[in-house]
Amino acid sequence: MFENLKKADPEIYESMKRELKRQQRNIELIASENIVSVPVMETMGSHLTNKYAEGYSGKRYYGGCEYIDEVETLAIDRIKKIFGAEHANVQPHSGANANIGVYFAMLKPGDVVMGMNLSQGGHLTHGAPVNISGQYYKFYEYGIDKDSGLIDFDEVRKIAHEVKPKMIVAGASAYPREIDFKKFREIADEVGALLMVDMAHIAGLVAAGLHQNPCEVADFVTTTTHKTLRGPRGGVILCKEKYAKDIDKAIFPGIQGGPLEHIIASKAVCFKEALSDEFKEYQVQVAKNAKALAEELIKRDFKLISGGTDNHLILLDLTNKNITGKAAEKRLDDAYITANKNTIPFDPNGALVTSGIRLGTPAVTTRGMKEEDMAIIAEAIDLCLTYDEESKARTLVVGLTEKYPLYEEYNVMD
C-alpha cells in the first residue's frame, strides 16, 4: 500500500511512515481519537473523491450523481437505524460544522443560548467567547457542582428561568459521567427552549445502548463520526422530521458547498460496522477498560474528577502530584503515552497550562487491550507522573504495543 505515493512524493511518504510508527509504538489515550478499520480507511482513499455532488440525493446541481446518491442514502438510512432518528444529514465536514449548522438553521445573531462552560467540560462550539458560536449568539454558561463534579442541574434550571434561552445545548468534551438528557428536556420545556445535544464523544456508547439516547428527547442531536463511532473525520446532524428542511438548507447552501462523498461513503461503512454485534461488544469493553483504568489510578493516589467514570474518558486532577497538565502531557509523551492536558473545573492554571490530564480508552480497546492491560497503563502513568521514571514506563508501554499491533491485516507501509 502507498507504493505510488512513495514514488511520487517521498517526503510526504516518509512523514506518513514516521506517523504510522508513532501510532504503533505509542499507547493512545486521547479520548477523542480512535483507530479506523481497514475498510473505512480504504473508502476514504477512493475514487469517490473525484465527484462533485452539491445538493442532496435526487436533487443535485451536477450530473452523474446516481451512484453517489446510493452511497449517501445508505449512510443516512444506517445512522437513522442506529439511533432511531427521524432525519439525518451526513454532509457536515466536522462536528463543529454540525453544531454551527444547527445554530444557523434555528437561531438569529444575538439569540440567547445556554451551553456548558468550556473549562468545566464543555466544547468550544458551545459558546466559548473565542469561537464563532460565542460571538454570534448570546451564550450563558452552566457548569458542574464543585463537590460532586456532576452537572449542576439546579444551576441549569435557575439560569434557564432567568435568561429564557431559545436553545439549550447539552453535551461535553471532558465530562466522565452519564448525562441525564431527560432532565435537560424537562428544563427546556419549562422555558420553551429548543434542546440540542452534542453526543460527539459518546455516540458509540449510545449506539450500543450503554448511554441514554438523546434522539429520544432532543430536537437536534449532533455528533462526530471519528471518536467512539470509530469512523472517518466528519460530522452528522440528527433531528425531528419537522426540522429536516431547515437543517438541510443550513448545511447546503448555508455553510457548506460540495459534500465530501469519499468521506460520506466511509461514514456509511462505519455505520454498518456500528450495527454489528461485534461493535456493541467493543463498546462494552471500552467502558470496562475506562472503569478499570480509573480504579487502578485511584489505587495509585490519583484524583479523578467526579471520582470515576461512566463512559470512555477519565479526567485526572493533578493538583496533588505537584505537576501541571502541560508538564504531564510532555512527560507522558516521552514515555510513549499520548494524552492531552485539560482544564479541570475551577482550574487555577488556565487553558494553556492546566491542572489536569484527559484520558480515554477507545483506541487502546480497538487494539484489543482488556482490563488487565489497564493496570499496566496505570502503572506506566504512575511511573511518569509520580516518580519521574519515564524510562521504566517506556519499557511497559513498548511491551503492550508490541503485543497489540495497530493493523494486523497487512503491512501498511514498509
From Swiss-Prot:
SUPFAM superfamilies: PLP-dependent transferases (SSF53383). This is Serine hydroxymethyltransferase. Catalyzes the reversible interconversion of serine and glycine with tetrahydrofolate (THF) serving as the one-carbon carrier. This reaction serves as the major source of one-carbon groups required for the biosynthesis of purines, thymidylate, methionine, and other important biomolecules. Also exhibits THF-independent aldolase activity toward beta-hydroxyamino acids, producing glycine and aldehydes, via a retro-aldol mechanism. HAMAP family: SHMT. Belongs to the SHMT family. Its cofactor is pyridoxal 5'-phosphate. One of its GO terms (biological process) is tetrahydrofolate interconversion. PANTHER family: SERINE HYDROXYMETHYLTRANSFERASE, SERINE HYDROXYMETHYLTRANSFERASE 1. It comes from Clostridioides difficile (strain 630) (Peptoclostridium difficile). One of its GO terms (molecular function) is glycine hydroxymethyltransferase activity. The record marks H226 as: Plays an important role in substrate specificity. GO terms for cellular component: cytosol. It is an enzyme of class 2 (transferase). Keywords: Amino-acid biosynthesis, Cytoplasm, One-carbon metabolism, Pyridoxal phosphate, Transferase.
